[in-house]
Amino acid sequence: MDWHSFRIAALLLTSLVVLEVNSEFQIQVRDHNAKNGTIKWHSIRRQKREWIKFAAACREGEDNSKRNPIAKIHSDCAANQPVTYRISGVGIDQPPYGIFIINQKTGEINITSIVDREVTPFFIIYCRALNAQGQDLENPLELRVRVMDINDNPPVFSMTTFLGQIEENSNANTLVMKLNATDADEPNNLNSMIAFKIIRQEPSDSPMFTINRKTGEIRTMNNFLDREQYSQYSLVVRGSDRDGGADGMSAESECSITILDVNDNIPYLEQSSYDITIEENTLHSQLLQIRVIDLDEEFSDNWKAIIFFISGNEGNWFEIEMNERTNVGTLKVVKPLDYEAVKNLQLCIGVRNVAEFHQSIISQYRLTVTLITVTVLNVVKGCVFQPGSKTFIVDSRMEANHTVGEFLATDCETGQATNKFKNVRYRYVMGNNPENLLVVDSGIITLRNRVTMEQYERLNKRYEGTVLSIHDSLQRTCTGTIIMVLCGFWTTTEHPTTSTEKPVTLSITPNVDNVHFGPAGIGLLIMGFLVLGLVPFLLISCDCGGAPGGGAGFEPVPECSDGAIHTWAVEGPQPGGITTICVPQMPPGNANVIEYIDNSGVYTNEYCGREMQDLGGGERTTGFELMDGVKTSAAPEICQEYSGTLRRNSMRECRDGGLNMNFMESYFCQKAYAYADEDEGRPSNDCLLIYDIEGVGSPAGSVGCCSFIEDLDESFLDTLGPKFKKLADISLGKEIDSYPDPDPSWPPQSTEPICPQHMEQLASGHPSISPHFGKTTVISENAYPSGPGVQHPMLIPDPLGYGNITVRESYTTSGTLKPSVHFHDNQQASNVVVTERVVGPISGADLHGMLEIPALRDGTNVIVTERVIAPGSSLPNSLTIPNPRETSNVVVTERVIQPTSGMIGNLSIPP
């Protein structure tokens, strides 16, 4: 292989690619954000050299026209065709306008005016190359023109005067404040770099502060700040750009620093000692003024002082009250001094501030004791009554000038009574003397007059006056209080009685036993409490209403909701929508009325009281009355018109609950009647139909099951109900036989048997019952719901001797049919029409046990059109549906047995 030829071919191919492809390339630069960890890619495009001539930088504030052209653009397309160059952007067609212009032929860009970097730090010029038609020949080009900064802006402080404060005695290098200044020149440039400097301090004794030239932080230079010497400093700070260079621009600002006060001065008293004198037995509110000197800030807690006693005031004779406005303490005498007890006192006092001392002097503080010498002056005293008051008792027998008692004053110097002194004359006079009752002479108190009843009442049984002892030479006086209790003023002589009662003589035997609460009474009280404590134990141990011989306890009361009312899955219409209930009439002849009426099950929901008694193993119910319908009684009664035993009501089941099961039977009978009445309003066979022939419809409408009817057979018309037959007869003009009223009013007023309201003893047999019952009977439903638990099959006898019976519907629905249920139909029935029978439990369990539907017995004229058994689940046991036997004139339109729940036991539905 010729490698030389291959290299030449490769070079030629590369040249062609370079010529054809646009001569530009992109460089992506990765920008990593350290804060959130993201990476961004920026595209940098390199233009071809022929398209751009790099723009020259422009200096702000100068005439840059001498540098024109500052840039030149050129396109390679100009070699083949004429090219027009145009520019746009800020400074061209956007404000500020007209700064840049371009030569459209040559592509030279010129600057025409002075620029300001603080207004526009750089310009972006968009360049375009256009052909004669105005179309772009090249991609638009961005041309950046940078404006060079000059130092044309001085620093600017954010505040004219900065305010700061600091505590006195602060440590060195403690931060006071921080200054803030800005420069409008280009950031991170020497022109915007500011240096701070303190150029003046007032007072200027010694420099106290220093400033960081870069950050502007002002700090203390030493710990010699003293508010008591200078409370405020003023600084002048200069900020210069270009890092404080001589060619930089500068600005100045003031700083005012306030020195805060601390408790760094120990207070002291104006004098080191005090001497005072005071007379004995005197009180003084301003005995001495003590001034406190403190150099801290006035009216602050550092300045306010507290003067306290160190010693000498053990008797609490003195107090010191401080004046917070003047910081002066006043010494007061609050308790008299006795010269005989204390002649001289040495009071030691100290002083401190309200606030704690500062840490700088707390170690230097020493308690300074100031001495106050108190001299007590002796004063010649007079006399005093000891005690100050005296009580006397005065009764009505005391006459005038009667001596009540003696009340003498005592000399304070000697402590003797005043009547002991011969050369000193004390005299006594009465001060306050109510009713002017007493007279005093040399301390002897006598009655001026006898106390009368009026005085006694005005004084309210008590006299209170004063007596004065006066020393004339010393002019001393003392006062004593005299109290007299007045008693014995209710006598027979002063207040004669008008009572006619005889006087009662009482004798008091001394030295008898004490009448107060003694040990025997306390013992009885304790025994009473013990007996009360035994009562709860006796109540617990006693037989509270239990049966004799049985243990204590409570008899459980069953709940009605679970005892008698079951949870039924099928709910019929409300009782308000039930039509009139038809009660079947009595059968002819001397039939067993008990079985007949017991099987009818006609009840209502309203009762008027109930009483049940046990009668020799049986059950008797009295007072059982229906508000609507036939009045019944559960005991055998004797009817006047019919023979046999008539039992109007019977209780087949009495469960533990409080609801009679006969009421439940009546309730479901009414529900069944409601279903039958509802069925009258819709066509016969209006139910779910099952077709066995796939793809063939039902001719003449869905009137029944056509599984065994041939095509185009009209025998299905025979299965129509009586209403349709009657309609057909009317259409053909035949004679219409009236049908019995399905809802006759029952019972007739004339045929209702009158039963006695009292019970009679039946000797033998029963009175005969006249055949007063009709042949036409409508039975709505025979429903016997079974309760939970295993029970024996319950046979429900059918009424005998029916004729022309129409059975509307028979439903047996229950949540779970555990026991066996047996349904009996009419015996020896003729002309029977059964419209529908459905045996279908609600739930979806299996049918356990045997489902049996016996055939009709002794029936004639019976036509069975369809019997369908469609269980919803598996039938583990046998399912038997026998054929009708001995039937006559009976039309059974449909029977559907479709269980969907578990049925445990035997389900027997006779035809």
Swiss-Prot record:
The keyword Glycoprotein applies. Residues 24-49 form a propeptide. PROSITE patterns: CADHERIN_1, CADHERIN_2. It holds the Pfam family CADH_Y-type_LIR. GO terms for molecular function: calcium ion binding. Expressed in epidermis, brain, liver, skeletal, muscle and testis. It is found in: Cell membrane; Cell junction, Desmosome; Cytoplasm; Nucleus. One of its GO terms (cellular component) is nucleus. It comes from the Eukaryota. The chain crosses the membrane at residues 520-540. Coiled coil: none annotated. Glycans are attached at residues 110, 180, 401. Residues 50-157, 158-269, 270-389 form the Cadherin domain. Residues 541-911 are cytoplasmic. Residues 50-519 are extracellular. InterPro entries: Cadherin-domain_protein, Cadherin-like_dom, Cadherin-like_sf, Cadherin_CS, Cadherin_Y-type_LIR, Catenin-bd_sf, Desmosomal_cadherin. Desmoglein repeat repeats lie at residues 783-809, 810-839, 840-869, 870-897, 898-911. The keyword Coiled coil does not apply. One of its GO terms (biological process) is homophilic cell adhesion via plasma membrane adhesion molecules. Keywords: Calcium, Cell adhesion, Cell junction, Cell membrane, Cleavage on pair of basic residues, Cytoplasm, Glycoprotein, Membrane, Metal-binding, Nucleus, Repeat, Signal, Transmembrane, Transmembrane helix. Three calcium ions are usually bound at the interface of each cadherin domain and rigidify the connections, imparting a strong curvature to the full-length ectodomain. This is Desmoglein-1-gamma. The lineage of its organism: Eukaryota, Metazoa, Chordata, Craniata, Vertebrata.
